[in-house]
A protein has these predicted regions:
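Extended, loop-rich substrate-binding clefts of extracytoplasmic carbohydrate-active enzymes
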Residues: 32-94
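Short coil/turn motifs at secondary-structure junctions
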Residues: 71-73, 95, 106-108, 124
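Active-site/ligand-binding surface loops and adjacent short beta/alpha elements
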Residues: 110-111, 120-162
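Acidic-aromatic substrate-binding/catalytic surfaces of carbohydrate-active enzymes
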Residues: 1-33
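Short, well-ordered beta-strand segments enriched in hydrophobic/aromatic residues
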Residues: 90, 97-105
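Structural motif
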Residues: 19, 26, 96-98, 110
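A domain-level signal for the structural core that forms small-molecule/cofactor-binding pockets
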Residues: 85-87, 104, 109
C-alpha cells in the first residue's frame, strides 16, 4: 500500500536496542528495525487513528482539528506507561497548508518529547511528466556522522556546510 502525506512522528529517529532514557525513567521500546540495525524507529503516533474534534470549510479554505488520547488502551502503553493527549490543527488556504501540533502530558512522570514529520512526495506531479524532469533541492546546514547501525555517533566534529 502506498502512503503519501506528512505523518507526525512522535519519538522520531532511532533508539539503540529500543532503549529510551529520560531524567526519571528508562523505557524499553520494541525493536522494529531488523538486523543489522536492531533499533526502535519512528515511534507509533503516526499509525494511530485520530478523532476529528471539529472542522469547517468555506470559499477561503478549510480547517480541521483532530486529537489522539494515549493511555492504557493503546498497545504501545506496555512499553511507555505514560498518558498524554496529542492535538493536531490543519488550515488549508491560498497561502498553503498550516500545521500545528501540541502534546499535553497527563502523567506524574516527565513525558519525553521529540517530534518530526516524515515528508513523502508522490512524483511525477502531473500526468505525462517524467521523474527525471523533477529536481528537488534541499539545503544541508549540518552533517552528522552515523555509525553502522545508523545512529548518530555524537561526534562534536560534525561538518558545518556552507
Amino acid at each position: 500500500a502506498e502512503v503519501w502525506g506528512l505523518p507526525t512522528l512522535y519519538l522520531p529517529n532511532r533508539f539503540a536496542d529500543g532503549v529510551l532514557k529520560t531524567s526519571d525513567a528508562t523505557y524499553q521500546l520494541p525493536v522494529n528495525e531488523a538486523a543489522p540495525f536492531h533499533n526502535h524507529i519512528h515511534g507509533f503516533l503516526h499509525k494511530r487513528e485520530h478523532n476529528v474534534v471539529a472542522y469547517s470549510a468555506n470559499e477561503e479554505g478549510a480547517w480541521l482539528r483532530t486529537s489522539y488520547v494515549y493511555n492504557e488502551e493503546d498497545p504501545f502503553f506496555q512499553y511507555m506507561p505514560l498518558r498524554f493527549t496529542a492535538d493536531f490543527f490543519f488550515v488549508l488556504s491560498e497561502y498553503g497548508l498550516e500545521y500545528k501540533f501540541s502534546i499535553t502530558n497527563q502523567s506524574p512522570k516527565k513525558l519525553p518529547v521529540s517530534v518530526a514529520t516524515h515528508t513523502t512526495i508522490s512524483a511525477p506531479f502531473v500526468d505525462g511528466a517524467r521523474e527525471e524532469d523533477i529536481r528537488l533541492q534541499v539545503p544541508v546546514v549540518e552533517k552528522w556522522t552515523l555509525n553502522e547501525r545508523c545512529l548518530p555517533t555524537g561526534d562534536p566534529a560534525a561538518e558545518r556546510l556552507r
